[in-house]
Each structure stands twice: as C-alpha cells, then as structure tokens.
Amino acid sequence: MYGNIDGHPLRVMLPKTLIFNVEGVEVLLTHIGGYPGKYAPGIIQQLRSNNTRLFISGHSHILKVMNDNTLKLLHINPGAAGIYGFHKVRTLIRFCIDNCRIYD
C-alpha cells in the first residue's frame, strides 16, 4: 500500500488499503486512518464492512496501541522506524497472531 509521500508511479501500482486475514483475524492496513474516536473519513465504514479486528495505520509517526471497544478491534500505529522525519525515536511493534488471538 502507498503513503502520502509516495508519488504517482507507486500509487498506480499499489492499493491505498490492504485487507487480509491472518490466523482468523481480519486486518485492515492503511497509511492515513486516524485512531479510535478520531478516524479518517470513510475508515469506520471499511472497518465495519470487513469485520476488522486489527486496524493498522500510521501517518502521525506517533506510537499508539489502543482498543476500540465500540468496533471491537485493536488499533496499532507503529510510529516511525525511518531515519528521516521529525521523530526523535525510531519505533516499531512486534506482536503475535495465533488462532484468532492477538497478543504479546
């Protein structure tokens, strides 16, 4: 999937959003998605229509892991792992998905 900094060549080759299933968990991955209580326009409809249990989005470069009790999903913003940008600390998230469970 592409992000806001990617140019036309990547945007024509890659989707804006990825939706896939891992070990029985529906995952939605997009660059600009917001977070529980402040989702980007159109995201709630996608989350509901795909029965999403794990929503991963970025853009803010701020590490956040939050439950959305209304939509019954886990939201992860992994922060920023690159060497360029305004962030001072590189972050990432590691977790497990096994038999419909998200943990660690």
Region roles according to the model:
Residues 1-24:
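Core catalytic region of metal-dependent phosphoesterases/phosphodiesterases
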